[in-house]
Amino acid sequence: MNKIIKLIFVLCCFCGIAQAQPQRPKLVVGIVIDQMRWDYLYRYYARYGEGGFKRMLGEGFCVENCKIPYIPSVTAIGHSSIWTGSVPSIHGIAGNNFVKDGKVVNCTADDTVNPVGSDSKAGKMSPRNLWVTTIGDELRLATNNRSKVIGVALKDRASILPAGHHANGAFWFDDKSGKFITSTFYMDKLPEWVNKFNKQKFPNKYLSQKWETLYPIDSYKESTSDDTNYENGIVEGEKAVLPLDLPTLYKKHGYKILRNTPFGCNLTFDIAKAAIEGENLGRNTDTDLLTISCSSTDYIGHQVGVNAIETEDCYLRLDKALADFFAYLDQTVGKGNYLTFLTADHGGVNNATFLQDQRIPAGIWNKKGLVDELNKNLKTKFNTNKDLVKTIMNYQVFFNTDIIEELGLDYAAIKQAVVDRLKKDKDVHYAFDMEKTSIESIPEELKFRAINGYNRERSGGVQIVPKPGHYDYYSSKGTTHGAWNPYDIHIPCLFMGWGIQHGESAQPHYMTDIAATVCAMLHIQAPNGCIGTPIF
């Protein structure tokens, strides 16, 4: 009898241990739609199908009031902040480009690595400029590297930064070869599944057709007409009118034209499926992670703006691509076995001319010649023949601090002189010394975003905040992003699948809460720079 009791006790202990193991999904899929404004969920809602955005809204949990907690609101920072739960001040990615060691650098450029799959410089990329861990890094650490982490996107930074340092691979599109490539940071040769995918020449198939509207063009009621002075051509020098003869454009411009069509999103989901099959994602003992970024929405948005038929058609096609991808996940991983979230890295402002035509205050902030003007004024004021201002980007003024230090000049006084000049600009709302942000007489909504966005080593010394509806852009047509305003920082945030109950919340949340939420659901440590709070 005693032996039986002992046996039962031991079995109960083992059962307790088994039950104590945290429940996790087989696969986590994070989808970032580049430049997707929150209102796109509803602007085109009536024409969405049941399996894409509507499925996420109907089955999942929608965070209606999710915003970006920093400036500038640009792609590299957005992707970094989503997947790290952090901000530029901490994670180090201060822009798509920023100043590092006195030089302007691309956020993922790395001369210490070589391209894999191409001889293009597009392969000399890595996440080394990212100072913190990502969700995927922490997942790999938590499972003793048993979990697999893969990142895919057309843009290098949109694949590399989400996947993180410890990923099994990150793959991005090379315009020169029309193939997906990687770098020696991850591996010395492409996996066989990537080679197999590249040999299928999906880009050629997509570029062998016309881009025609999905529905009759006169039924696109959420957009302006198809030929307006608000739009650049989908490719510079081409007219912004559908249909587009892609075979002809391909002959003139090469593979890069694919980025500026909705079919770039289709190609991204194609390689996402290939990654799932090639790496057996979602079929392992431990949770795997796939990061996906749809970059074409950003390329199209920049060229034609928020109100274009091309933008509307892109999202209607994206909705179908999402529906197809979710159906694929249901079949391969199993409905209820995967957790997915969808969000954006930033939004986009309405074209200034369009707003002016609606009698809404707007304009292009013209900084042409401003660097030269500032340097001329500073040379006179501080009695030097050296240029003290390096450049203006990310709505920040960057200074030649090494020269200022060498000459023994008062850096604070130099910055104040620049601030005084900028405040005279009719399109500038605020200008301030980044090191004095906390004591500036500006709204808290701006103050905390400027502080979060300021990286002492990589940001400029003076912050510029244009008036609402005003922005810095090379063209009066199309659109851009980067500001603190709702059109740039209010983003969609949807969760669906494993562990998610249907619902919605209008409570304030931030982009940085996404990583905290996913890690809490997986019962793993949050990324080491995470400042977010779990949403549920």
Residue ranges and their predicted role:
Residues 63-83, 151-161, 293-295, 339, ...:
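Short, solvent-exposed turn/loop segments enriched in Gly/Ser/Thr/Pro and often Arg
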Residues 1-24:
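Bacterial Sec-dependent N-terminal signal peptides
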Residues 48, 65, 74, 96-124, ...:
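Secreted, luminal/periplasmic, and some membrane-associated catalytic domains
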Residues 87, 95-286, 295-302, 423-426:
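His/Asp/Glu-rich, glycine-adjacent segments
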Residues 25-37, 56, 82, 139, ...:
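Beta-strand elements within well-structured catalytic alpha/beta cores of enzymes
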Residues 37-43, 68, 121-127, 255-262, ...:
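Second-shell loop/turn segments in exported
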Residues 41-90, 148-152:
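Short, structured active-site-proximal loop/turn typified by the sulfatase FGly-forming signature C/S-X-P-X-R
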Residues 369-409, 480-522:
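Substrate-binding rim/cap in mid-to-C-terminal beta-strand-loop elements of soluble/periplasmic
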